[in-house]
Regions:
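Phosphate/dinucleotide-binding and metal-coordinating scaffold of catalytic cores
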Residues: 1-320, 324-420
Length: 420
């Protein structure tokens, strides 16, 4: 049986700006199918004896460890890998190279995608090398992260890339592959650097959009801020007639310092696609915060208000990848809110609210308030405040984002819970 092994050296940069060797990731390739195992570095374990675990499949002990159940790769490394947009860019680039070199395109495996992400903009604080004395991967010192002034060019590149069905436009790939490969999701996007050295995610219009998605995400983002929820800095810019570009500041960076981020999918031991259909529930997030949160009271209140807010705007894409945690010196904290969008025909969330029901229903949210250590009286008051804030401001914010009256009427059903 044909087999070969790839050894990847894993580092973390969340305890200091100096990278610390975390351990070794072993990737076994048997007839084009990869399997993974990981072993912590002994010195890292000694220095981290009382540290929080980074993945439920990677407990803090010596020796090889393997993903559990049907998982092929540890969630810790899945969070560092690109999602659909980044994978599409890498796959298209391989096709171009194969065409130029007169060969068949190589099938890219999970480890290729993992190592293909540009290190400078990689999400979180986990980093990778193939040689301990070599660079962190992927490395490209000749072309730094694009500056803010390149946004218009990047939006044009993303549009040309989407419209290029043959996949042979080399120049668009070159402009997008590095700033876009580090990010999750399916939408065209890129990471850019502002004049103060802060990283931002730019989400561009897509040819598949039926509405101005960027403008509506900005509306929802600002509504969340008005409701007192934790959201990063954001802005909206129009570069073309095709739609708005929504920009949000990366919360996994503090200047040059990296902050470790883990999705709820990883920390709850879930696989991609986990949803209400398999019983995945907000109550699991509640349990994780109670057991592992550094500020459980604050985070439980924030999480519960997010449930009500998601209902108020009919955000039906609130799956486990769209919830996350950041690791600080004192432990795990609920990450800022991200990727919230209104859906006019939405009537169920992606996750169950209680154990088995995902219906957009204020009664359901109130039912689980005690699990979040919120009294019935306080929950009713908080819910009323969220709904009133959405009801009183969604039209105004939509107009400020340049959305027409007809666009607002089309999206009105998304806010029906608040408008009742």
């Amino acid at each position: 049986m044909a087999s070969n092994q790839k050894i990847i050296y894993v580092y973390e940069s969340f305890r200091s700006t100096t990278p610390n060797y975390l351990g070794t990731l072993f990737v076994e390739n048997v007839r084009g199918r990869e399997s993974y195992s990981f072993e912590y570095d002994a010195d890292w374990l000694k220095s981290s004896a009382n540290y929080m675990y980074l993945d439920p499949d990677l407990q803090l002990y010596a020796g090889r460890q393997y993903p559990s159940g049907a998982k092929n790769v540890f969630g810790l490394f899945a969070d560092s890998s690109p999602d659909r947009w980044g994978r599409l860019l890498m796959t298209r680039r391989e096709r171009i190279l194969a065409e130029q070199e007169g060969r068949k395109p190589r099938k890219l495996l999970d480890s290729d995608f993992l190592l293909g992400v540009y290190d400078e903009t990689r999400m979180g604080a986990i980093r990778f090398k193939l040689d301990k004395d070599g660079p962190f991967l992927s490395d490209d010192s000749e072309t730094p992260t694009p500056p803010w002034t390149s946004l218009r060019t990047l939006e044009e590149a993303s549009r040309q890339f989407e419209n290029d069905e043959s996949g042979l436009e080399q120049k668009w790939i070159n402009q997008l592959i590095k700033p876009g490969s580090s990010l999750g999701g399916a939408r065209p996007k890129a990471t850019v650097l502002d004049t103060k050295g802060n990283l931002w995610i730019a989400k561009f219009p897509s040819k598949h959009d039926d509405v101005n998605v960027g403008a509506w995400e900005k509306v929802t983002h600002d509504l969340a801020r008005l409701c007192g929820l934790d959201v990063p800095e954001s802005m909206l810019i129009d570069f073309s007639k095709y739609g708005s570009t929504f920009l949000v500041r990366r919360f996994d960076r503090n200047g040059a310092a990296r902050i470790h981020f883990a999705s709820a999918m990883t920390m709850l031991g879930k696989t991609d696609g986990a949803s209400a259909a398999d019983g995945s529930s907000y109550l699991e997030l509640v349990s994780f915060i109670k057991a592992n949160g550094a500020a459980p009271k604050r985070d439980l209140t924030e999480l519960w208000k997010r449930i009500v807010f998601n209902m108020a705007v009919s955000d039906t894409d609130d799956h486990m990848r769209n919830h996350g945690f950041i690791l600080k010196a004192d432990g795990w904290h609920l990450s800022p809110l991200y990727d919230v969008n209104p859906v006019p025909e939405g009537d169920e969330l992606s996750l169950c609210v209680n154990e088995d029901d995902a219906t957009i229903s204020l009664d359901l949210a109130l039912e689980i308030a005690p699990y979040c250590e919120i009294s019935t009286k306080d929950a009713a008051a908080m819910a009323a405040d969220v709904l009133k804030t959405v009801r009183d401001n969604w039209n105004r914010l939509a107009a400020e984002c340049g959305l027409s009256r007809s666009a607002q009427e089309y999206m009105r059903p998304a806010f029906s819970l608040a408008l009742e």
